[in-house]
């Protein structure tokens, strides 16, 4: 049994079963999300903890961005490059998550990226998850919070083979402008060197141009769908008892179709479950990747990879399950009536045999 009545998230493979099978748009099975917890030692302190779930509300809309990037922030003589472009930001989960699409032009041509901001209600912190369209890889998140009118998120990284700290800061926030600055520190945060500066000004609604859409692998799935799931209660145990549930999926394009985000809501007898599924294409590997987040802990899990062949896509991953390493396969295709179907299976013998433990059927509600 991987889905507990209280909906506490079980181990990685257990969360995989919950998430992957709730939506055809969701193929993540490698989770292990760190869950922050507030300090219960003082009722007064806990009561005073600030709810930052709407910290990024200022970013809603479309913005012009002017970017300056310093190639080596630790070298005072380092060259820099400048880019101009646009940023479109919209809220998800009523503001507990935000999706930011970025495109800009500079000396090296056109550049696209996206950022998914997720709020952790236990830790009262935000995570910033960034993907560059040219590389198609998900960076480790910056994590932090807003205080005194600005937001600081931090991450440990390497620069020229040296360990550094990275700080992302939002400041100078008004209704029509704000600044994002990314700085590096090689002395434990005593001093910071600016590596990236983006100054954003709001674009009036009358000047916003519609995005030109292009065909991609998942264009058919754009829209709203009803889902019906059937789940095996005890995988890899010889059990044959299944349970069923219904829900909805709202699927939207990003980057004109080379990435997408789906919002998943499923109703179980013991309560509702909400997920986000973020999927993007890696043009170098020619593979699709997908990761998910739950409303409970507001962090993205590790992504699976897969690719289409003959109208079907199969994603594979290795996961711990009941103390043993297993293989997880998640597949998507079109059924007899042309509607999407997804299926998850586990293998305990290295892929020689597979046991299906989840199936989802979808019915279109609307195409937008």
Each language-model region and where it sits:
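Sec/Tat signal peptide C-region and signal peptidase I cleavage site
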Residues: 30-34
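N-terminal secretory signal peptides that target proteins for export/translocation
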Residues: 1-12
């Amino acid at each position: 049994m991987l889905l507990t009545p209280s909906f506490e998230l079980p181990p990685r493979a257990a969360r995989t079963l919950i998430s992957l099978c709730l939506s055809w748009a969701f193929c993540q099975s490698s989770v292990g999300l760190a869950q922050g917890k507030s300090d219960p030692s003082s009722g007064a302190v806990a009561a005073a903890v600030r709810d930052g779930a709407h910290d990024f509300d200022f970013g809603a809309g479309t913005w012009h961005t002017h970017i300056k990037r310093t190639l080596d922030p630790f070298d005072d003589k380092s060259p820099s490059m400048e880019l101009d472009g646009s940023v479109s930001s919209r809220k998800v989960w009523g503001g507990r998550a935000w999706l930011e699409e970025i495109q800009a032009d500079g000396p090296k041509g056109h550049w696209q990226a996206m950022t998914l901001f997720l709020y952790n209600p236990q830790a009262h912190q935000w995570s910033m998850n960034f993907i560059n369209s040219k590389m198609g890889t998900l960076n480790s998140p910056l994590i932090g919070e807003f205080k005194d009118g600005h937001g600081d998120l931090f991450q440990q990284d390497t620069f020229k083979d040296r360990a550094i700290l990275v700080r992302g800061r939002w400041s100078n926030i008004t209704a029509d402008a704000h600044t994002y600055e990314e700085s590096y520190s090689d002395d434990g945060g005593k001093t910071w060197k600016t590596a990236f500066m983006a100054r954003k000004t709001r674009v009036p609604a009358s000047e916003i141009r519609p995005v030109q859409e292009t065909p991609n692998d998942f264009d058919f799935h754009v829209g709203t769908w009803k889902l019906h799931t059937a789940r095996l209660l005890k995988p890899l145990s010889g059990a044959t008892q299944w349970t069923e549930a219904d829900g909805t999926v709202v699927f939207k394009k990003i980057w004109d179709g080379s990435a997408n985000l789906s919002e998943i809501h499923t109703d179980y007898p013991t309560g509702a479950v909400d997920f986000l599924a973020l999927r993007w294409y890696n043009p170098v590997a020619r593979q699709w990747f997908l990761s998910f987040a739950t409303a409970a802990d507001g962090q993205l899990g590790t992504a699976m990879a897969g690719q289409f062949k003959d109208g079907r896509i199969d994603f594979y991953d290795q996961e711990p399950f009941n103390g043993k390493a297993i293989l997880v396969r998640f597949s998507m295709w079109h059924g007899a009536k042309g509607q999407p179907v997804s299926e998850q299976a586990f293998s305990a013998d290295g892929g020689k045999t597979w046991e299906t433990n989840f199936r989802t059927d979808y019915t279109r509600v609307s195409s937008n």
